[in-house]
């Protein structure tokens, strides 16, 4: 049994590496040093290294104001507040995004494929999409790191 477990763990580790999309050119491109200069340490880790913030810690998780959620890295509009809902997951959840600004990729980091969401303007990691969202709308749950977003209230939009 220990040998079988070890084999499984090595297999998962092997599957999680080298499966990411090759480097893609995005309209907004910065050096690592430039990203570090403009992003908070947490936003940098999430957007540039696909980290995940701790559940229930993000300032936008329970935001109920009307407005638009933009990429914290490049300010591209990603989500409208009318599609945000409380999934109970501890991260901001939306049943849909602004599709032309989202990129879908496959993430193998935990040993099996998940649908990763990225900003298609800067390539920043946002979170993942799951099929356990509200059945009366899209059935999708865009589970997004609060650190990957900035919020612009309706009265401040240009």
What are these regions (language model features)?
Residues 13-33:
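Sec-dependent signal peptide cleavage junction
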Residues 5:
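Internal, well-ordered alpha/beta segment that forms a basic, Gly-enriched binding/recognition surface
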Residues 26-27, 36-70, 76-158:
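A short Gly-Trp-Pro
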Residues 15-19, 71, 145:
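Acidic/polar residues at beta-strand termini and the immediately following turn/coil
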Residues 8-11:
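C-terminal motif of bacterial Sec signal peptides marking the signal peptidase cleavage site
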